A protein has these predicted regions:
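Short, exposed beta-strand-loop hairpins at the edges of beta-sheets
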Residues: 77-79
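Short S/T/G/P-rich N-terminal loop/turn motif that feeds into the first structured element of a domain
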Residues: 1-73, 82-94
């Protein structure tokens, strides 16, 4: 399998600062390690601070699989991520 870079953009129901506290928490770090995701970048839009981008790397298909799990969706929504606004694009280098 090849390495895949997955770009997520989405809206927040809370502030970016509140969301970042959750995203950068030790619990989320442990979750990422358990499922094999490596976060590369997270940031907010200069135009709309409630619009966020997150870039992950993992083995091909892992990110889409993890983020389509109903339990994962429930947990990320609890942190302020409005799942229905999520746009996902995937990229490979080969």
């Amino acid at each position: 399998m090849s390495l895949e870079t997955t770009v997520f953009t989405f809206k927040l129901s809370n502030t970016f600062e509140e969301w970042v506290k959750m995203f950068d928490s030790s619990e989320i770090d442990a979750f990422h390690k358990t499922v094999g995701l490596t976060p590369l970048y997270r940031g907010k839009s200069l135009i709309d601070p409630k619009e966020v981008i997150v870039i992950h790397q993992a083995e091909e298909g892992v990110a889409k699989h993890v983020f389509s799990d109903p339990e994962t969706i429930k947990n990320i929504e609890a942190g302020g991520h409005i799942y229905s606004t999520t746009k996902i694009t995937s990229w490979v280098s080969n």
